[in-house]
Amino acid sequence: PELAKFQQAQMLIQARWMITFVFFEKELYENPDQDLNTLWWKIVSEVQLVTPPENRNQPDWAAKIHFTLAPVYYQNYLLGELMAAQLLRHIETTISPDFFTKEAGELLIEQFFKPGALYNWNEKIRRVTGEKLNPAYFVELNCKSSK
């Protein structure tokens, strides 16, 4: 139970981090001439609820290597977590509550991996689980209370 609580907390913190990146990049590309450090700390404080250090005026946003080496990518991490939660719930409800079964592996291989890039990610998750990407499964997995 303690590990599950830790994993839930870790994922929720990571989700806020990912959302911070996505919001910042959107604003950065819409107006690259603005004060990006002020923008960075504005978004960090709104999304992550972290107070910026006093009297700090350094380009903290630029310390994130993704902005230069893998721009407009961070949302993919969150999409992956959303898809994983939906696949997990689908397997638990249609195959077995135990994810690590031969049948679950076969479903993933045959229906998810073998089609490769034949379908875009949104169509693929719909074909495999029967519904479009639904964040409710991520919320259920990461926001439920563990007793």
Which ranges hold each PLM region?
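C-terminal, non-catalytic "cap/extension" segments appended to globular domains
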Residues: 2-147
